């Protein structure tokens, strides 16, 4: 009996990080597959599932990935920690990109990379995860496909992270870096002031060193709206123009 071997399609996030081509997506903090379907109709490229601050459990993550894949959206997720068991479960549910928060050192980043990539690039565990856990006739090729098509974003959210940013950026397997501005503002002594000029100065300096190391920051290629911003903007528009309501 012959089987159709599933193949991973290209990861638009990973490609865009390399080419600096602009892509668009939405940040979700709650499980809402119908919302993913609505967003897909707007021509977005990816969905960002917030597994650190959001309400998702692993069943929610899998359902969101199924909805995203159905509409050709790449699902990426911010994980709550960089440990191998956590990262493995996100990847096994169908997430195509991992965003690692609170990375302070090169060793922190290497720990995450080791969990994200299969050998020889890392030591990711292989088991019964989706979406490609059946009918794999060529397992070595499948593992290579996984490595070639998983995106990795590293978040800098501390003073130590700022200092190590360029060294982290130079690591093979890191596609892009981003800044957790609220946590950075606290770490720099300006809680609740992510737009403070000193925060902006330190972020700009680190961003320039990251680019000099050959990697982009998220804002260089990714446009992302948070779902709360989308909902508030839409409701304000409807309240300002009641005739826009369909009934």
What residue ranges belong to the model's regions?
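Active-site mouth loops of central-metabolism enzymes
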Residues: 17-33, 76-80, 150-163, 224-232
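N-terminal amphipathic alpha-helix/helix-capping segment at the start of soluble metabolic enzymes
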Residues: 1-27, 136-148, 204-212
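Glycine-rich, proline-tolerant flexible connector loops at the mouths of alpha/beta enzymes
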Residues: 35-62, 181-197
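Short, acidic/polar
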Residues: 28-41, 81-89, 159-171
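C-terminal alpha-helical cap/extension of soluble enzyme domains
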Residues: 124-130, 134, 150, 156-163, ...
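Alpha-helix-loop-beta-strand connector modules within alpha/beta enzyme cores
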Residues: 58-92, 116-121, 144-148, 195-218
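Conserved, mostly hydrophobic/aromatic
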Residues: 26, 39, 50, 98, ...
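Conserved anion-binding
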Residues: 85, 97-172
